Amino acid sequence: MSVEQRVKEIIADQLGVEMEKITPEARFVDDLGADSLDVVELIMAFEEEFGVEIPDEDAEKIATVKDVLDYIKSKQG
């Protein structure tokens, strides 16, 4: 399974949104209805799933699905 597909599944599970709504440009808060706690839980789920650590200063910059995909791919090398 691709990183993108797994990220989308995590978002769908955590936020209860339909997969079709999870586009690279979708913003977690504005488009997918996440609140600040949801975002923290998403970051933790991404860290666990992909074996990366996302420091708070980096997490604050992650606002869209594309942001998290780019971040994970950059850390996986």
Curated annotation (Swiss-Prot):
Pathway: Lipid metabolism; fatty acid biosynthesis. PROSITE patterns: CARRIER, PHOSPHOPANTETHEINE. The keyword Cytoplasm applies. Keywords: Cytoplasm, Fatty acid biosynthesis, Fatty acid metabolism, Lipid biosynthesis, Lipid metabolism, Phosphopantetheine, Phosphoprotein. Coiled coil: none annotated. The modification O-(pantetheine 4'-phosphoryl)serine is found at residue 36. GO terms for molecular function: acyl binding; acyl carrier activity; phosphopantetheine binding. InterPro entries: ACP, ACP-like_sf, PKS_PP-bd, PP-bd_ACP, Ppantetheine_attach_site. NCBIfam families: acyl_carrier, PRK00982.1-2, PRK00982.1-3, PRK00982.1-4, PRK00982.1-5. This is Acyl carrier protein.
